[in-house]
């Protein structure tokens, strides 16, 4: 693949991940195993409120093809096939879920040194079509996306964004919700290993005159333990502690509290991911 700009979905992703990844209010346990033949098997159990769910996912890579199959307790089977270099600098992703036969989807991604283009469509009679394009370089890129409903002949979305990326920082601005919202984020790393960072995000909803400002941070206590925290102008405070109990095996404890309504019970989450 080329070393050009990333996908449109990559714009603002690093800042979003620091503010959202690993924060949860559920109890989750997963264990992953790997065979000598290249098959990866992951079993996951989740308790959300009073609801229990589980799934088993398997992944197998053969030459330029990657096969993913996930079976859950709702008796649904999700299959995803990813093919790289089917044509030069091109990737194809096909997915479908059984028994929901209308869920079949095909996406094609093309990577160039100065542009990235994707097209995705649901494989049914009147599909939804999504198209994205990004121009630029790994340092600075401009992108746009649009979704079109062939049944109603209307656009379901059209958004645009810009991203500036340096080794120690990332800035992004996204005009979303058909021009009704604006999100700007900035992420800065303070060490070469990217284990300590600060992030800020400003979100503006024009139709409701709503503003949300969120700041967050990541700090590595040592090589196996890290803490994260975030706070927004609505008073929502989140924090988590993540510890590597074994190589590649993580335990994460997270919590969230409304500082403007301390009488409410805080929310707690626990996650254990084992990768022997």
Curated annotation (Swiss-Prot):
CC terms in the record's Gene Ontology section: mitochondrial outer membrane; pore complex
Other observations noted: Plants silencing VDAC2 show an ABA-insensitive phenotype during early seedling development under ABA treatment.
Descriptive protein name: Mitochondrial outer membrane protein porin 2
Known outcome of mutating residue 223 to P: Alteration of subcellular localization
InterPro entries: Porin_dom_sf, Porin_Euk, Porin_Euk/Tom40
Observed effect of gene inactivation: Dwarf plants with lesion mimic phenotype and increased expression of the pathogenesis-related genes PR1, PR2 and PR5. Delayed flowering, impaired development of anthers and short siliques with sterile seeds.
Domain text: Consists mainly of membrane-spanning sided beta-sheets.
Organism listed in the record: Arabidopsis thaliana (Mouse-ear cress)
Cellular location(s): Mitochondrion outer membrane
Induction context: By the bacterial pathogen P.syringae pv. tomato. Down-regulated by abscisic acid (ABA).
Similarity comment: Belongs to the eukaryotic mitochondrial porin (TC 1.B.8.1) family.
Entry keyword set: Growth regulation, Ion transport, Membrane, Mitochondrion, Mitochondrion outer membrane, Phosphoprotein, Porin, Transmembrane, Transmembrane beta strand, Transport
Tissues in which the protein is found: Expressed in root tips, steles, leaves, sepals, petals, stamen and pistils.
GO molecular function: porin activity; voltage-gated monoatomic anion channel activity
PANTHER family for this protein: MITOCHONDRIAL OUTER MEMBRANE PROTEIN PORIN 2, VOLTAGE-DEPENDENT ANION-SELECTIVE CHANNEL
Gene symbol of the encoding locus: VDAC2
Modified residues (Phosphoserine): 76
Function: Forms a channel through the mitochondrial outer membrane that allows diffusion of small hydrophilic molecules. The channel adopts an open conformation at low or zero membrane potential and a closed conformation at potentials above 30-40 mV. The open state has a weak anion selectivity whereas the closed state is cation-selective. Involved in plant growth and development at the vegetative and reproductive stages. Is important for leaf and pollen development and mitochondrial membrane potential steady state. May be involved in ABA-mediated early seedling development and disease resistance.
């Amino acid at each position: 693949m080329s070393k050009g700009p990333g996908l449109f979905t990559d714009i603002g992703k690093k800042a979003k991940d620091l503010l959202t990844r690993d924060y949860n209010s559920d109890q989750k346990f997963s264990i992953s195993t790997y065979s000598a033949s290249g098959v990866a098997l992951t079993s996951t159990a989740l308790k959300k409120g009073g609801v229990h769910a589980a799934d088993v996912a398997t992944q197998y890579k053969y030459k330029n093809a990657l096969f993913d199959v996930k079976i859950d307790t709702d008796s649904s089977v999700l299959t995803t096939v990813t093919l790289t270099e089917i044509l030069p600098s091109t990737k194809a992703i096909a997915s479908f879920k059984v028994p929901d036969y209308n869920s079949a989807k095909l996406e094609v991604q093309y990577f160039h040194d100065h542009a990235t283009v994707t097209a995705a469509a649901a494989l049914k009679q009147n599909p939804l079509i999504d198209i994205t394009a990004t121009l630029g370089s790994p340092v600075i890129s401009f992108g746009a996306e649009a979704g079109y409903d062939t049944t109603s002949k209307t656009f379901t979305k059209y958004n645009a964004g810009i991203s500036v990326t340096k080794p120690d920082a990332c800035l992004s601005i996204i005009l979303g919700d058909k021009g009704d919202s604006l999100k700007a984020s900035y992420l800065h790393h303070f060490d070469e290993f990217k284990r300590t960072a600060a992030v800020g995000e400003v979100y503006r909803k024009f139709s409701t005159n709503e503003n949300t400002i969120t700041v967050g941070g990541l700090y590595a206590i040592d090589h196996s333990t890290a803490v994260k925290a975030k706070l927004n102008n609505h008073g929502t405070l989140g924090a988590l502690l993540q510890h590597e109990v074994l190589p590649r095996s993580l335990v994460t404890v997270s919590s969230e509290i409304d500082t403007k309504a301390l009488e409410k019970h805080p929310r707690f989450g626990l996650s254990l991911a084992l990768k022997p």
